[in-house]
Amino acid sequence: MSIVSQAEQILDRVRAAGAEGDLIIDQGEALSLKAKDGALEEHKVTSSQVFGLRVIKDNRVGTAYSEAADGESLVALVDQALLNASYAAVEAHEKILANALKLETQDAQLSPIDQATVAEKIELALTIEARLAAKPMVKNVPYNGVQDSVGERRVYSTTGLEARSKARMMHCYAYALIESGDKNAMEGIGQAARRFVELDPDRLVDQAYQNTFDILQGAAIPSGKYDVIFDEEILPSLFNVFSMMFSGKSAKDGVNPMRDKLGEEIADSKLTVRDLPLDTDGFGYALFDDEGTPAQALCLIKEGALSSLIHNSMTASYFNSASTGHGTRGPRSTLGVGLHQLEIDAGTADDAALHAGAYLVVTDLTGLHSGANPISGEFSFGASGYLC
């Protein structure tokens, strides 16, 4: 039975029970390779498929999932979701959207056919480990790998929605352990691309080694006030820690300190932050959210002022607003909200002004979650980088 036929079978049973619902079907395939001491340590091939159903009946929401796809299991999936709904509290704002759109991403762009052989990927894994291990003072390369993964998501609903997205990611990474006397350090870096040929092992090895060597030679700097520039790899992690400030769900739950600050200045007037889900250069690209709402660009902070929160259909209903296309839900999880991919507008300072005087380039932060309180905004992180 085809995926479409299975979805129809599930949703027909939901309708027959007098309920409405939506169904997420996730499928994935992955290849994972790791090297150790010049030999292949891991060659893992995995595949997965999971059905995740949400039903709403009498304003009560129930969810259930199944990794099995036989007819009996799919019947049980519907029955379990309906049973769970019968015990749930009433949620007046959570509905299945009246959305009959047909949405589909472009496979040729986001999930291109892989021209590289498994042998070539194995050779890449061995090459990365060998080249990094051969660098001066490198004791070993404890963490390294080459991965090729393809993920596909389909979303169907009782109102006629049919949405499909598919994406491929090639990923390689390496961490070096360097020892010199009684000092040691371990650092690394990774790369991601949609095509195997876009991976650059020479650059990966050189950067991983240089990062580790620099940390080995590093020392604490005197306490004081420093101008700070965040490395482009660490800045997204910092923003992610405080992403709750944009959440319509946390605002609904009463734990978002920005709930009543729309239109107010909350940051430097030079800062403009946007969520750009339709930028195909990023791996956060999304044509639609997990409710099937079309994704669109959204300005979150405009010249320092909070301009929008992100909403799914439930939080939008609660605030008498419209969904911004930021609904999140997995086959095993309930409805939430989440960002796609943030972009900061370019500033006006030129390089000369930006790098004038002493400044600290932060390349790593530790304690990002344990050291941060996204409600109060207080934080205390360990930081490392370069004093320039």
Regions found by a protein language model. Give the residues of each.
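Active-site bordering "gate/hinge" segments
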Residues: 1-296, 302-305
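Dual-mode signal for accessory low-complexity, basic/Gly-rich regions
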Residues: 261-388
